[in-house]
């Protein structure tokens, strides 16, 4: 069941990839993918290339995939282990969602952080109180870690 669904999503992704994103299996393992997300142009992550690891559970799509950043990123909703605080990867997951929608949600999280549900409270605090310092720090991390 899971592998059929994952194959279908892979075909759909290859046919109609979400903008600024790509994803596919690592080697022969259909349950482990790597995705690439380009930093959204209107964000401090612009120009960066962010690698994201996706692990599908055996009961996918009834359980959400485990998605984490491999590239270091300065963001209130993404911690130093690469964990992402995103409702659709937790309690708001639905079998109707796809990896394509997950990647788009992560892109929009890069553009519009959610400082009211932070994974890294000190970055959220800076985002709320000193936006320009947040943006310059995020930009310098992007240059340091996400640009080849």
UniProtKB/Swiss-Prot annotation:
Pathway: Protein modification; protein ubiquitination. It is an enzyme of class 2 (transferase). SMART domains: UBCc (SM00212). Keywords: ATP-binding, Nucleotide-binding, Transferase, Ubl conjugation pathway. InterPro entries: UBQ-conjugat_E2_core, UBQ-conjugating_AS, UBQ-conjugating_enzyme/RWD. Residues 1-147 form the UBC core domain. Belongs to the ubiquitin-conjugating enzyme family. This is Ubiquitin-conjugating enzyme E2 11. It comes from Arabidopsis thaliana (Mouse-ear cress). The lineage of its organism: Eukaryota, Viridiplantae, Streptophyta, Embryophyta, Tracheophyta.
